[in-house]
Amino acid sequence: MDERALALQELRTAADLNTELRELKARSRLTYRQLEERAAEKGELLPRSTLADVLRNGSLPRPELLAAFVRACGEGEYVDDWLAARKRAAEASAPGRGPGGSAGSGGSG
């Protein structure tokens, strides 16, 4: 496993994931329109307005949007690592869960 894959394993929260997504876009040096066009060349949908909303609002992207974005940015070999990071972030933000917590924790009386 290389450094990039290890770094992606460190991502645990939606905020961490979103920060890394913004950094990925910056490293790509591509505009939202260029990213949308790159995805379209591969037969994928990557609406630039949706992508901009996700990166601006810090929300978790849908898995298919995340995969298309990662490939468009040139990190296609890490799609599975990104999707695993997204899954961890989604689980961490699920109701009744928190960092280090578990579902159903907390007393009922």
Predicted regions and their residues:
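Short amphipathic recognition helices of helix-turn-helix/homeodomain-type DNA-binding modules
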Residues: 1-30, 37, 44-46, 58-109
